[in-house]
Each structure stands twice: as structure tokens, then as C-alpha cells.
């Protein structure tokens, strides 16, 4: 066993040296001790249209008996594109069991991006990702930045020996309709980042949800041993909506839960009201299913106290 781990480590070192030689500064070492790396891949070295960041952790079992743990990050990567690319990477692993595959993964991603650049789609940096834009959304993904949530989630995955995980039950909330736009929340309990992928895949099996204009999501998983959270969010083209929803979940201290809000755009711009509807959908389903702790009640009580204080002051003034 020890010999195998040593062989794996040496194989990883050789592979990383080769990748550094091939890709130069594009290949970034995030944490050498934890074997965490990332690379930004694009469709062109001159004026890239499509860009994606591949982040990986190399477990002790790689390459002999385990694939790299990975995450694909890009503002435009969603739905069918994400599933297609993930399936391509999995296929490469299955066809090359026991071998180093990172170079093949990087080049498969580049091939995928080149394919998209050759279509009629102008690309994410040349078009608005939403029919309503209030906040600038940067198309560049800084390869050197790896947030703590990703590191926590990947390390959590390394230590998780629960085996095959089941798809958690998914609950669908009531719809909110405003000027022909419809919003609906979906909620599921989660205890690992892998379950997040299972839930998304399951939701996308529903044609109505899969064809929604946006599927915004956020999740929070509490890691008791570390007294910390694995948390992440996705705007899915509705700029800053995912961050707003995650912030709401933090205020509510929602734990071990994922919320997806689908929006079907009806052709009439809603402006800031769309964020209100997205968060209301999320809040309603979280409160209905008891995922809110004292945080919400505390904020309500504070607001109530302020209101009472103002009323008392008015009476005193009179």
C-alpha cells in the first residue's frame, strides 16, 4: 500500500512537472502540500472568446485507482454544456484507468471551447448573459484565485468514504408570477458537494426546468469537524442573483440545504424586482421546511424593536 502511494506521488510529481513545462504560467500551484492545482483554458491564445478554469486536487490514490477531484468554473458553463463536458472528462478517465490524464483533460476542454467558438454563438464575453443587466459581470476568471469553499469541498470529498450517494428528495415550491415572468424554488437537503451535482442532474431531467431562462442556485453544508461551511452559488446568467441568494441563506443560517430558483422570462423587463422574487421564493421554501434558525427571527425582532423605538420617540416628541 505504501509503495503504491509513493509510486502515485512520484507519478503526480512527474505529471505536474510536464504540465508546467507545457503550459508555463497558465498552470498554477494553489497548495502543493494538498496537491491542489488549477489552469485557465481558452479557445485561443490571442483573443479568447470562451474561457474556463479547471481546478483539481490529486488524491493519494491517483493515478492508480482514483481520478482527480475537479471543479469547472465559468460564468457561462451551465446545463447541457456542463453535463457534456463532465461526461467527456469521465470518459477519458474510464478509457485510461491507472494512467495520468490531466493533459488529456486540459486538451479536451480546449477542444470543447474551440468547438463552441466555431458555432454562431458570439460567446459569453461578447453578449449579455441576461436580458436584464444591473451589475457588470467580468468574463475573466483569475486562475490564481481559489476560494476556501472549493478547497474545503474538495478536501471533504477526499475524506468522505460514504460510497455511492443517493439523490436527496427534491421539494418544489409555489410559483410567483409577475409581468409574465414566473419564478419557482426547488429545495433539497445536502451533506456533500457531490449531492449538489446529483440534484442538478435530476432537475435538468425535467424539460421545463432545463429550459428555464435561469436556474440560480446556492447551497450551504456545515462541516462539524472543522466548524466551517462548504458553500457556493451559481447565477446561471442572472448576474449576482446567486450571491444574493447565498447571502440570504447566510443570514437565515440555513445549513445542509440547497435551493434552486428557476426563472422563466416572459418578455417584460422586471428590473430589481426580479431579485426580490428570487429571494422571496428561496426564503419561503426555506422557512416552510424549517431550514431557518434564529437568524431570521432575530433580524425581525431587531426591526420590530427599532419600529417600536421610533413610535415611542414620536409620542415623546408630541
Swiss-Prot record:
GO molecular function terms attached to this record: protein sequestering activity
GO biological-process terms attached to the record: cellular response to amino acid starvation; GCN2-mediated signaling; intracellular signal transduction; negative regulation of transcription by RNA polymerase II; neuron projection extension; positive regulation of neuron differentiation; regulation of cytoplasmic translational initiation in response to stress
Main localization of the protein described in the UniProt heading: cytoplasm
Coiled-coil annotated residue ranges, if any: none
SUPFAM superfamilies xrefs: Ribosomal protein S5 domain 2-like, UBC-like
Compartment(s) of residence: Cytoplasm
Biased composition (Basic and acidic residues): 308-318
Keywords: Cytoplasm, Differentiation, Neurogenesis, Repressor, Stress response, Translation regulation
Function per UniProt: Translational regulator that ensures constant high levels of translation upon a variety of stress conditions, such as amino acid starvation, UV-C irradiation, proteasome inhibitor treatment and glucose deprivation. Plays a role as a negative regulator of the EIF2AK4/GCN2 kinase activity; impairs GCN1-mediated EIF2AK4/GCN2 activation, and hence EIF2AK4/GCN2-mediated eIF-2-alpha phosphorylation and subsequent down-regulation of protein synthesis. Plays a role in differentiation of neuronal cells by stimulating neurite outgrowth.
Subunit description: Interacts with GCN1; prevents the interaction of GCN1 with EIF2AK4/GCN2 and inhibits EIF2AK4/GCN2 kinase activity. Interaction with RPL39; this interaction occurs in a GCN1-independent manner. Associates with ribosomes; this interaction occurs in a GCN1-independent manner. Associates with actin; this interaction occurs in a GCN1-independent manner.
Full protein name: Protein IMPACT-A
Species in which this protein is naturally found: Xenopus tropicalis (Western clawed frog)
Lineage start: Eukaryota, Metazoa, Chordata, Craniata, Vertebrata
Gene name tied to this protein: impact-A
Amino acid at each position: 500500500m505504501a509503495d503504491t502511494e509513493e509510486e502515485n506521488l512520484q507519478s503526480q510529481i512527474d505529471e505536474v512537472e510536464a504540465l508546467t513545462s507545457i503550459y508555463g504560467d497558465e498552470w498554477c500551484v494553489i497548495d502543493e502540500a494538498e496537491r491542489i492545482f488549477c489552469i485557465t483554458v481558452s479557445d485561443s491564445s490571442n483573443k479568447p472568446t470562451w474561457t474556463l478554469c479547471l481546478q483539481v486536487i490529486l488524491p493519494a490514490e491517483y493515478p492508480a485507482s482514483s481520478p482527480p477531484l475537479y471543479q469547472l468554473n465559468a460564468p457561462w458553463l451551465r446545463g447541457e454544456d456542463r453535463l457534456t463536458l463532465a461526461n467527456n472528462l469521465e470518459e477519458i478517465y474510464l478509457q485510461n484507468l491507472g494512467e495520468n490524464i490531466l493533459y488529456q483533460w486540459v486538451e479536451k476542454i480546449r477542444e470543447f471551447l474551440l468547438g463552441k467558438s466555431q458555432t454562431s454563438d458570439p460567446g459569453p464575453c461578447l453578449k449579455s448573459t441576461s436580458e436584464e443587466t444591473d451589475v457588470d459581470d467580468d468574463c475573466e476568471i483569475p486562475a490564481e484565485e481559489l476560494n476556501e469553499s472549493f478547497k474545503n469541498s474538495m478536501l471533504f470529498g477526499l475524506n468522505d468514504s460514504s460510497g455511492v450517494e443517493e439523490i436527496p428528495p427534491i421539494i418544489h415550491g409555489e410559483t410567483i408570477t409577475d409581468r409574465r415572468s414566473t419564478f419557482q424554488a426547488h429545495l433539497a437537503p445536502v451533506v456533500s458537494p457531490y449531492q449538489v451535482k446529483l440534484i442538478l442532474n435530476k432537475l435538468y431531467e425535467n424539460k421545463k426546468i432545463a429550459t428555464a431562462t435561469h436556474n440560480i442556485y446556492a447551497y450551504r453544508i456545515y462541516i462539524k469537524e472543522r466548524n466551517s461551511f462548504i458553500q457556493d452559488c451559481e447565477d446561471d446568467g442572472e448576474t449576482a442573483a446567486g450571491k444574493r441568494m447565498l447571502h440570504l441563506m447566510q443570514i437565515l443560517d440555513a445549513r445542509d440545504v440547497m435551493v434552486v430558483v428557476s426563472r422563466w422570462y416572459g418578455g417584460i423587463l422586471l428590473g430589481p424586482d426580479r431579485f426580490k422574487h428570487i429571494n422571496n421564493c428561496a426564503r419561503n421554501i426555506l422557512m416552510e421546511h424549517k431550514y431557518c434558525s434564529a437568524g431570521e427571527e432575530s433580524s425581525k425582532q431587531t426591526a420590530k424593536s427599532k419600529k417600536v423605538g421610533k413610535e415611542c420617540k414620536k409620542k415623546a416628541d408630541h
